[in-house]
């Protein structure tokens, strides 16, 4: 069982800053005083990204969490990411500015239901996308991210069947790219499933020269319309190296902040959700704010706590992922 508790180690709370500038200054002071590191996912609000020490996707941030010398890790993302940081660095204090920052995909795969599903396939290698709870990770043989899933699955023994969870769209894409047959858990991301195909086709008609880039959590019919499919970090890299100057981006629009910062002379367009709604923004990612970031550093809460037995079991497949990735990178040099 995973416990997410609010642990208070500070006796007093400083006066609440009144402006964004004051919040940023107070956060910088607390970060230095506490020897804290602020990790932010690409889907965070721009003002959170701008104050972070490191910005990245799930794989990059898990590596940072494993290697940091900081005493306190503040994870500006969602709770499965903060859990991963705690799994990798149990001796450190891991803070999440808002405990309500969950994940529809992780919620789509309850640990007890996953255990029953896994028991029906006892001979399968269990590969779980990092977007799942610590309790599901603890039941897995290997963890992957969207940036390394195809490479890792391709390395698995050919004579062993594979169970993949929890994202069905990513699973189908990995199956297609790797050529491996997967038994796939039927989970989905509420954001990546809402992109409007009609809106995408209209944008393509209006900007025929634009490259369409998509995250593999999108629906298959949208991926088929893309010029490039990859994780958030891979999408960012593609826009930097591709000579094109216009890009239609099928993922959470928080990534556009980094794209525009790095390539101010290029144009980036996000795709609206079905019926033109603004649901292409992840409501959970956007729960973290400057005030909540300041408050969690001021009070040292909410903090993430994981039952040690669960943590140790969850660490094994995460470490296996990191080791396989290191071996793969070493073989390429």
From Swiss-Prot:
Predominant place of localization: cytoplasm
Gene3D superfamilies the record matches: NadA-like
Note on how the cofactor is bound: Binds 1 [4Fe-4S] cluster per subunit.
One GO BP: 'de novo' NAD biosynthetic process from L-aspartate
Entry EC number(s): 2.5.1.72
Any one Gene Ontology molecular-function term assigned to this protein's record: metal ion binding
Recorded catalytic activity of this chain's protein: iminosuccinate + dihydroxyacetone phosphate = quinolinate + phosphate + 2 H2O + H(+)
Domain of life according to the entry: Bacteria
Pathway info: Cofactor biosynthesis; NAD(+) biosynthesis; quinolinate from iminoaspartate: step 1/1
Needed cofactors: [4Fe-4S] cluster
Keywords, in A-Z order: 4Fe-4S, Cytoplasm, Iron, Iron-sulfur, Metal-binding, Pyridine nucleotide biosynthesis, Transferase
Residues reported in the UniProt entry to bind [4Fe-4S] cluster: 103, 189, 282
A single cellular component GO annotation: cytosol
Pfam families membership: NadA
Residues the entry annotates as binding iminosuccinate: 41, 58, 129-131, 146, 215-217, 232
Family: Belongs to the quinolinate synthase family. Type 2 subfamily.
The protein's role, per its UniProt record: Catalyzes the condensation of iminoaspartate with dihydroxyacetone phosphate to form quinolinate.
The name this protein goes by in its record: Quinolinate synthase
Organism annotation: Prochlorococcus marinus (strain MIT 9303)
């Amino acid at each position: 069982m995973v416990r997410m508790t609010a642990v208070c180690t500070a006796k007093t709370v400083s006066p609440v800053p009144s402006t964004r500038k004051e919040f940023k200054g107070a956060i910088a002071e607390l970060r230095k005083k506490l020897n804290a590191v602020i990790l932010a996912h690409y889907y965070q609000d721009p003002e959170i990204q701008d104050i972070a020490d490191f910005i990245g996707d799930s794989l990059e941030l898990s590596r940072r969490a494993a290697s940091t010398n900081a005493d306190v890790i503040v994870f500006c993302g969602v709770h499965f990411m903060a859990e991963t940081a705690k799994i990798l660095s149990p001796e450190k204090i891991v803070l999440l500015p808002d405990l309500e920052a969950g994940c529809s995909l992780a919620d789509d795969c309850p640990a007890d239901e996953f255990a029953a599903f896994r028991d029906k396939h006892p001979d399968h290698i269990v590969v779980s996308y990092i977007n799942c709870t610590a309790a599901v990770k603890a039941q897995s043989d290997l963890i992957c991210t969207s940036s390394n899933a195809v490479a890792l699955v391709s390395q698995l023994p050919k004579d062993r069947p594979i169970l993949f969870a929890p994202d069905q769209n990513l699973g189908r894409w990995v199956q297609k790219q790797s050529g491996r047959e997967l038994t796939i858990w039927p989970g989905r991301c509420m954001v990546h499933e809402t992109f409007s195909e009609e809106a995408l086709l209209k944008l393509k008609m209006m900007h025929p020269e634009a490259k369409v880039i998509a995250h593999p959590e999108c629906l298959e019919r949208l991926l088929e319309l893309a010029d490039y499919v990859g994780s958030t970090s891979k999408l960012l890299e593609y826009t930097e190296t591709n000579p094109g100057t216009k890009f239609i981006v099928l993922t959470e629009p928080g990534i556009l902040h980094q794209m525009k910062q790095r390539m101010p002379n290029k144009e980036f367009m996000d795709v609206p959700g079905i019926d033109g709604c603004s649901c292409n923004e992840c409501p959970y990612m956007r729960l973290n704010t400057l005030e909540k970031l300041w408050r969690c550093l001021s009070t040292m809460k909410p903090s993430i706590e994981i039952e040690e037995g669960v943590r140790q079991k969850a660490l094994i497949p995460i470490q296996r992922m990191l080791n396989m990735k290191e071996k793969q990178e070493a073989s390429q040099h």
